[in-house]
Amino acid sequence: MGKTNDWLDFDQLVEDSVRDALKPPSMYKVILVNDDYTPMEFVIDVLQKFFSYDVERATQLMLAVHYQGKAICGVFTAEVAETKVAMVNKYARENEHPLLCTLEKA
């Protein structure tokens, strides 16, 4: 019977390991922050180009950024969120706009 208990313990250990390995990844909010210089049209362009929003939804989010100071553009895994933040910030700098994109844990 000792062997049966060993197998049960092993099975439980495997289940625990698999459960831990299959936990959903941490998610992060990608946020655009308002400033007084970036044109609204550029913000709409960013939302369409990097977040695949249609012009209507991009306009709604741009207005949220403008009037509320910031808006969530999407929620992604850490790697995707970090990549989007870096791409948006790089694109803004290349176009000489101070638009800031950040991330925070969801």
From Swiss-Prot:
Which residues does UniProt assign to the signal peptide? none
Any one Gene Ontology BP term = protein catabolic process
- Which Pfam families does this entry report, sorted A to Z? ClpS
Q: Which InterPro entries match?
A: ClpS, ClpS_core, Ribosomal_bL12_C/ClpS-like
The record's subunit annotation is: Binds to the N-terminal domain of the chaperone ClpA.
The UniProt entry's sequence similarity note says:
Belongs to the ClpS family.
Question: What is the role of the protein in this entry?
Answer: Involved in the modulation of the specificity of the ClpAP-mediated ATP-dependent protein degradation.
What name has this protein been given in UniProt?
A: ATP-dependent Clp protease adapter protein ClpS
Taxonomically, what lineage is the organism?
Answer: Bacteria, Pseudomonadati, Pseudomonadota, Gammaproteobacteria, Enterobacterales
Q: Which gene encodes it?
A: clpS
